[in-house]
Amino acid sequence: LDPQVSYTGRRNFVNTYEASGTYHLTGEKQITGRDFQTGDSFTFQVTGEEDAPMPDKVDADGKLTIEPTSGKTAALDFGTMTFDHAGTYTYQVTEESKDANGVISDSTEYTVKVTVKDANDGTLTANAEITGGEGDAVVFTNVYAPGAAALDGNANLKVTKELTGGSRGWKEGDSFTFTL
């Protein structure tokens, strides 16, 4: 057998290589001091740097809202990021602060650095390093402290200073400095 190929005119052959891979971003929401209850709502923000693909369960602004109604923990499922080329992708994950009804929000800012490597077989492998909190996972813990209030803006504060001991007494021009 002697195969021969002949062409009329010029022929171009273009080889393409496409690879893809995914990483699923999850976390946990915790509350201490009480259980979650009907009406609780927590919003989280995912911000990707440069051309980082966003997780598929956040909205167009990178936000995810959950409304747990019981228990002390709730799953956070930000969704899957789909990558089409190797590289390092960095994300910031935060909880929007809305201290209310004695619940104090967690202000931790997590950095999720996803390293995507090409396996040269049409697949990409993605591994994440999570920093910012305690451990290697995204965990936001709110604290319920009845009667606690987060002050924002102006607030009235009444303070009384009592001078005791000795016979010196309070004199005109005396002053004290208080630091809150």
Spell out what each predicted region is.
Residues 1-180:
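Solvent-exposed loop/turn and edge beta-strand elements of beta-rich ligand-binding domains
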